[in-house]
């Protein structure tokens, strides 16, 4: 699958995860609705499903990974930043096929696309601290 299709999958996963975080609706229902409403012709749909469902299902575990490295309480994080961090931490912890630097760079790009003006710097700072704990060999 092309890297652009994976990038689009990450973008869609952040949007679906954001929706789930706000609505607390069923994970599968949001996925079905999201895929029905979006043009997914340029999306790696299987990767989207893995990222979204994996990040949502493992949200508490992912939150525990990031919490010690946040400059504020987890509850004070914006929904976009939380979604981006959850996707990145899911990739770092569960998708060993994704290179370390790719996961971090993609998260920064997602924050630039969807987050507040300076959120990409915050995301980078958190991931720079937590990623070596997840992947000590930086691979």
UniProtKB/Swiss-Prot annotation:
Read off the InterPro entries from this record.
NusB-like_sf, NusB_fam, NusB_RsmB_TIM44
Keyword 4Fe-4S part of the UniProt annotation? no
Q: Which UniProt keywords apply?
A: RNA-binding, Transcription, Transcription antitermination, Transcription regulation
- GO terms for cellular component: cytosol
Return one Gene Ontology term, BP aspect: DNA-templated transcription termination
- Which Gene Ontology MF annotations are present? RNA binding
To which protein family does this belong?
Answer: Belongs to the NusB family.
* HAMAP family per the UniProt record, alphabetical: NusB
Biological role: Involved in transcription antitermination. Required for transcription of ribosomal RNA (rRNA) genes. Binds specifically to the boxA antiterminator sequence of the ribosomal RNA (rrn) operons.
Recorded hits in PANTHER family, A to Z, give: ANTITERMINATION NUSB DOMAIN-CONTAINING PROTEIN, N UTILIZATION SUBSTANCE PROTEIN B-RELATED
**By what name is this protein known?**
Transcription antitermination protein NusB
**Taxonomic source organism:** Sodalis glossinidius (strain morsitans)
Q: Which gene encodes it?
A: nusB
């Amino acid at each position: 699958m092309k890297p652009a299709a994976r990038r689009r999958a990450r973008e869609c996963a952040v949007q679906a995860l954001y929706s789930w975080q706000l609505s607390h609706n069923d994970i599968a229902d949001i996925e079905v609705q999201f895929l029905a409403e979006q043009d997914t012709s340029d999306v790696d749909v299987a990767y989207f499903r893995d990222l979204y469902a994996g990040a949502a299902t493992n949200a508490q575990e992912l939150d525990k990974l990031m919490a010690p490295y946040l400059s504020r309480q987890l509850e004070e994080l914006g929904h976009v930043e939380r979604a981006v961090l959850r996707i990145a931490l899911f990739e770092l912890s569960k998708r060993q096929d994704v290179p370390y630097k790719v996961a971090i760079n993609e998260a920064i790009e997602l924050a630039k696309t969807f987050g507040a003006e300076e959120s990409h710097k915050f995301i980078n700072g958190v991931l720079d601290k937590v990623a070596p704990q997840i992947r000590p060999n930086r691979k």
